[in-house]
Amino acid sequence: QPQKLSFSPNPHNKIGLYFGWRWIFLGWSVDVDDIYRKTNRKNKGTEFDLSLYSSKLGVDIFYRRTGNNYKIHKIRGFYDEIPSNYSENFNGLKVDIKGLNLYYIFNNRKFSYPAAFSQSTNQRRNAGTFIAGFSISKHNLDFDYEELPEYIQEKMNPGMKVNKIKYTNANISFGYAYNWV
């Protein structure tokens, strides 16, 4: 029987600075809960964002790092007696994500991407446009399976006992956007 562990981050509060001027936007945020609890530096979550918006192009560059504050929500294939609503804190997972999003606006003479998303320009009439996009992100997960409860480790398949998972996600998108003024 295949085994499955599902994790989700615990809710947390962030505080940060976000500065925008004309076509450039820079943001930084940090988990407030980690500052308040004075946890060690390894556990802190951080986020950086840099966005550039012009009439034809939009670019987002981002970096996100999570702390070790997760919950195990679903367990399958280990024990039949584990209830379906099982939930337990887990501090053995850390995630780093780096990414880039690119957008091209076809009707850039009438449609304003910055007016819709960054409020840095005005658009005087209703207008729509087709938008093409490209996105790529690199994900690095550090997984310490020895932080799992003992009864899960005992039944864990050897193939699930990994320390690092790395993958890259890339996609191309095409859509339509419309601004009502």
Indicate residue ranges for each PLM-predicted region.
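Transmembrane beta-barrel strands of outer-membrane/channel proteins
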Residues: Q1, F19, W28-V32, L52, ...
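Short loop/turn motifs that connect adjacent beta-strands in outer-membrane beta-barrel proteins
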Residues: N107-G128, D142-F143, V181
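Extracellular/periplasm-exposed beta-strand and loop segments of Gram-negative cell-envelope proteins
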Residues: S6-N10, I72-R76, S84-I97, L141-Y151, ...
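Transmembrane beta-strands of outer-membrane beta-barrel proteins
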Residues: L26-W28, F48, L57-I61, L100, ...
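Surface-exposed strand-loop-strand hairpins of Gram-negative outer-membrane beta-barrel proteins
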Residues: Q1-K14, F25-R41
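Residues on the lipid-exposed face of transmembrane beta-strands in outer-membrane beta-barrel proteins
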Residues: I15-W21, F48-L52, L100-F106, A132-I136, ...
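Residues that define the transmembrane beta-barrel architecture of outer-membrane proteins
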Residues: P9-I15, K42-T46, K94-K98, N126-G128, ...
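Hydrophobic alpha-helical segments and helix pairs
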Residues: G67-S120
